[in-house]
C-alpha cells in the first residue's frame, strides 16, 4: 500500500527538489489556502487573500511578497512561505476560537448546501445558457438526500459501505479547514452518487 501511494508522488517531490532545492511533497500552496479559509475577512468561498490582487498571477506575486517581507527574507522558499501563511491562519484561530469555530461550522454548511459555488467556471451562467449541460448535470441538492436515504435503506456489503463513508468523512474533514467550492467537493459527489443509486434501486 505504501509503495502504491509513494510511486505517483515521488516524481513530483523529486521535481520540486531539483527545481527549487526545497523538499516539497506535492505543492506548497496549502498554507495560503489555509489562511484564505481562516482569517477575519474569510467568507468561506472566496479564493483571495485579503489585501492581494484578485487575479491569479498578481495575487500569487502579492502572497509571496507579503510573506517574504514579513519574514525579512527575500529568498524565502515556497515551503517557508507556505508555513508563514499556515502560521497566520493558526494565529487567527487561536485569537478568536469561538469565531473560528462558527466559521468552520458555516463552511461545513456550505459543503452540503444546494448552491454550487463557482471556482474556475461560473456554473450558474453555463446552466442558464446551455440546455444540454442543464439536463446532463445532476445537482448536489438531488444527490445528497438520495445518498442519505441510500445509506439508511440501501443494500450492499457493509464493509464496502464503511470504506466509502470513511472516505466521505475524511475528505470532508480535510476540505472544511480551507474554503469550499463545487470543484473541491466534486469527489464527494462521485461517492454520494453510489449511495443515491442504491436508494433508487431499493425503491424501484
Describe every region a protein language model picked out.
Residues 10-14, 150-156, 167-184:
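Transmembrane-helix signature of polytopic, lipid-linked glycan biosynthesis machinery
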Residues 91-164:
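Membrane-interface anchor segments at the N-terminal boundary of transmembrane helices
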Residues 1, 153-161, 193-204:
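Membrane-interface junctions at the ends of membrane-embedded or membrane-associated helices
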Residues 1-17:
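Hydrophobic alpha-helical membrane-interfacial segments at the cytosolic entry of transmembrane helices
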Residues 25-111, 115:
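Membrane-proximal stem/loop segments at transmembrane-domain junctions that anchor or position
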Residues 1, 163-170:
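Central hydrophobic cores of alpha-helical transmembrane segments
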Residues 7, 139, 165, 173-174, ...:
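Hydrophobic/aromatic-rich transmembrane helices and adjacent perimembrane loops
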Amino acid at each position: 500500500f505504501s509503495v502504491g501511494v509513494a510511486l505517483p508522488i515521488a516524481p513530483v517531490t523529486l521535481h520540486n527538489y531539483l527545481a527549487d532545492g526545497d523538499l516539497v511533497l506535492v505543492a506548497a500552496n496549502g498554507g495560503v489556502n489555509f489562511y484564505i479559509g481562516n482569517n477575519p475577512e474569510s467568507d468561506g468561498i472566496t479564493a483571495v487573500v485579503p489585501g492581494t490582487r484578485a487575479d491569479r498571477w498578481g495575487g500569487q506575486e502579492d502572497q509571496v511578497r507579503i510573506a517574504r517581507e514579513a519574514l525579512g527574507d527575500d529568498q524565502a522558499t515556497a515551503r517557508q512561505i507556505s508555513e508563514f501563511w499556515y502560521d497566520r491562519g493558526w494565529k487567527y484561530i487561536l485569537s478568536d476560537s469561538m469565531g473560528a469555530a462558527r466559521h468552520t461550522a458555516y463552511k461545513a454548511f456550505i459543503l452540503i448546501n444546494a448552491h454550487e459555488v463557482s471556482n474556475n467556471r461560473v456554473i450558474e451562467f453555463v446552466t442558464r445558457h446551455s440546455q444540454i449541460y442543464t439536463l446532463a448535470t445532476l445537482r448536489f441538492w438531488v444527490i445528497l438526500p438520495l445518498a442519505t436515504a441510500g445509506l439508511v435503506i440501501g443494500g450492499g456489503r457493509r464493509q464496502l459501505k464503511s470504506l466509502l463513508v470513511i472516505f466521505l468523512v475524511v475528505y470532508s474533514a480535510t476540505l472544511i479547514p480551507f474554503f469550499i467550492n463545487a470543484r473541491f467537493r466534486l469527489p464527494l459527489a462521485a461517492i454520494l452518487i453510489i449511495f443515491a443509486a442504491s436508494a433508487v434501486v431499493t425503491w424501484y
